[in-house]
């Protein structure tokens, strides 16, 4: 059994950020509006030790979220979005934030780009461990 909570998490973030930012999955090269948030899962592997005749009990899951903002308040806007996202993924769901950093946006340096990665072990009942 594959445990996959990425659609659920994306839907929750979409609802949370609805009036504040455009959120997309997958990334668009030229978004029409800012702030712009992308969501992608980068890991969904079985935990081998948890497999028995009933199937896999635990899955390693990872998400990457990128925040793009523009304008005079771009840094503040990105940090506000980061806080909301972190409260949802770390606070509410229990995922471990493994990366949280500003990344240069090579295509357009007027765009502030911030990357956050979360990881966790999810059981067959969708409970998160880290």
Report the location of each language-model feature.
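Small/polar-rich, solvent-exposed N-terminal microdomains that initiate assembly or binding
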Residues: 1-52, 73, 80
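Short, charged interaction patches at domain edges and termini
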Residues: 1-10, 44-52, 56-60, 96-130
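Short secondary-structure junctions
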Residues: 14-20, 89-96
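Intrinsically disordered, low-complexity segments enriched in small/polar residues
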Residues: 32-34, 66, 110-112, 116
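Residue-level recognition of well-ordered beta-strand positions that form the cores
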Residues: 40, 64-68, 117-121
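Short C-terminal domain-edge/linker segments immediately following a structured domain
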Residues: 55, 67-75, 94-100
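Mid-chain, well-packed structural core segment of small domains
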Residues: 64-90
């Amino acid at each position: 059994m594959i445990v996959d909570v990425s659609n659920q998490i994306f839907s929750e973030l979409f609802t949370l950020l609805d009036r504040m930012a455009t959120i997309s999955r997958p990334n668009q090269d030229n978004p029409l509006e800012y702030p712009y948030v992308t969501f992608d899962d980068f890991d969904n592997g079985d935990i081998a030790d948890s497999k028995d005749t009933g199937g896999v009990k635990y899955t390693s899951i990872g998400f990457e979220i990128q925040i793009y903002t523009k304008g005079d308040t771009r840094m503040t806007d990105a940090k506000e979005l980061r806080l909301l996202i972190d409260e949802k993924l770390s606070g509410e769901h229990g995922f471990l934030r493994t990366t949280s950093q500003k990344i240069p946006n090579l295509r357009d340096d007027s765009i502030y780009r911030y990357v956050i990665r979360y990881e966790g072990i999810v059981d067959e009942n969708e409970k998160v461990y880290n």
